[in-house]
Amino acid sequence: MKARLPKEYQNRGANNMNSMIKQAQKMQEDIERVKAELEARDFTASAAGGMIEVTMSGAKVLKEVKLNPEVVDKDAIEDLQDVIVAGVNAVITQIEEVSAAEMEKVTGGVNIPGLV
């Protein structure tokens, strides 16, 4: 005699698999949406005590560098270059932190390598 499950339990494994696939597809759609939203945003950060302000897009494209007039000195080119590097790095760090936080909301904290 063959044991049979009641109808409500039949195909339960297939339903769970379909549910998991739909959930993964929705997560992928949410990830793409959040990525697009982040890339459309602008991020601004300052460095060196406000001597430089840098604006980048969420796609990490440098859009604007504002220097405090006190910074510009022909004899201080190396200092100016260091300040610009610090400003760019500060805004990239800001973008990465916000991106990671937004993606964590979508993935529920699951670490997906290469996502951000």
Regions found by a protein language model. Give the residues of each.
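Long amphipathic alpha-helical segments used for membrane anchoring, targeting, substrate engagement
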Residues: M1-E39, T44, Q94-V116
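Residues at secondary-structure transition points
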Residues: N15, V71-D82, A86
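Residue-level signature of catalytic and energy-coupling elements of molecular machines
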Residues: A24, K60, I84
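N-terminal intrinsically disordered, cationic/polar leader segments
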Residues: A40, S46-V61
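A short interface-forming secondary-structure element
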Residues: G49, L62-I77
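Conserved beta-strand segments that form the floor/walls of ligand-binding pockets within enzyme
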Residues: T55, K66, N111
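Stable alpha-helical structural segments in soluble proteins, enriched in small hydrophobic residues
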Residues: V83, G87-I95
